[in-house]
Amino acid sequence: MAGENGLTYAAAGVDIDAGNAMVEAIKPLVRSTRRPGADAEIGGFGGLFDLKAAGFSDPILVAANDGVGTKVKIAIETGRHDTIGIDLVAMCVNDIVVQGAEPLFFLDYYATGKLVPGVGAAIVTGIAEGCRQAGCALIGGETAEMPGLYDGSDYDLAGFAVGAAERGALLPTDGVAPGDLVLGLPSSGVHSNGFSLVRRIVSASGLPWDAPAPFAPGRSLGEALLTPTRIYVRPLLAALRATGRGAIKALAHITGGGFPDNLPRVLPEAVGIALDLDAVAVPPVFGWLARTGGVAVPEMLRTFNCGIGMVVVVAPERIEAVEAALRAAGEAPVRLGTVTPRGEAPVSFAGRLGL
């Protein structure tokens, strides 16, 4: 039998009591995400969801998982942790809604070298806010304290979301064809991809995170770059329901890879998309990044959303109805281009990006 001075888990760097205290602290946040089908209680071995109570009769489940990349490093270095969870939810639920599905529930994974009081709860504050924006329940998660694997209080996040659509309602439809029109929905800024390049540019600029943001008066550089990813779930679901099957033919979440890599994911082999860059209202952050980093336009287009976080492919005869439904839901759609026969590249560009 080990003596009184034998090793303990706490001595090895894992504080079970701190983990339990965090779970208790976040329970009210989790409960705030309750919705039909989920009571949003945590602490059991698994989370439960009742599809019938959510109103589905013949559903297809849609699952997605993602992270926030090195944007999390800015949260760590600035000490601001209460919005990065919104990004985490957004990256998952936006990938679900583009398939015509309603996000239903979310789970998170928070891994760190050392649990710091208040940090985990701040992260979950953002996750709960993201879930409320998306209308999905936070039904579980994992907090992993792993000394030696992460440096000090560094952490990483992963999210997992599941949604559902009635059979026959999934997107894209098989009817995407030349002549269809392409709408764009504005982004809030950089969103959650390209941050390894963002951080390299900031380092080259010599500006600290608390310096005034050159592109956002009244905000610090770190605060401006931590602007949360937009969650498009509610306006898109509202537009899909208001306009009926066939009006919206496809949706594309513009993340890493930009327009060139994400648009072909929802297109049939024989068609492409022609985009008018003059139609894009580019947020000032992208101009600053391009100028400060000397980043060429093709690299900007393949790394960042450049001001458009979601693309909507619409039947031309229904374009006014879709635009009206999106505006009624609080969106500001812009006409970006058209679906064309596929040329040399699946995505072609005209006009000039206003960097």
From Swiss-Prot:
Location(s) in or outside the cell:
Cytoplasm
Q: Which reaction does it catalyse?
A: 2-formamido-N(1)-(5-O-phospho-beta-D-ribosyl)acetamidine + ATP = 5-amino-1-(5-phospho-beta-D-ribosyl)imidazole + ADP + phosphate + H(+)
The GO molecular function terms of this record are: ATP binding; phosphoribosylamine-glycine ligase activity; phosphoribosylformylglycinamidine cyclo-ligase activity
Listed under GO cellular component are:
cytosol
Q: In which pathway does it act?
A: Purine metabolism; IMP biosynthesis via de novo pathway; 5-amino-1-(5-phospho-D-ribosyl)imidazole from N(2)-formyl-N(1)-(5-phospho-D-ribosyl)glycinamide: step 2/2
Sorted alphabetically, the keyword list is: ATP-binding, Cytoplasm, Ligase, Nucleotide-binding, Purine biosynthesis
- List, alphabetically, the InterPro entries matched: PurM-like_C_dom (IPR010918), PurM-like_C_sf (IPR036676), PurM-like_N (IPR016188), PurM-like_N_sf (IPR036921), PurM_cligase (IPR004733)
NCBIfam families named among the record's database cross-references: purM (TIGR00878)
- HAMAP family, alphabetically? AIRS
- The identity of this protein, by name, is Phosphoribosylformylglycinamidine cyclo-ligase
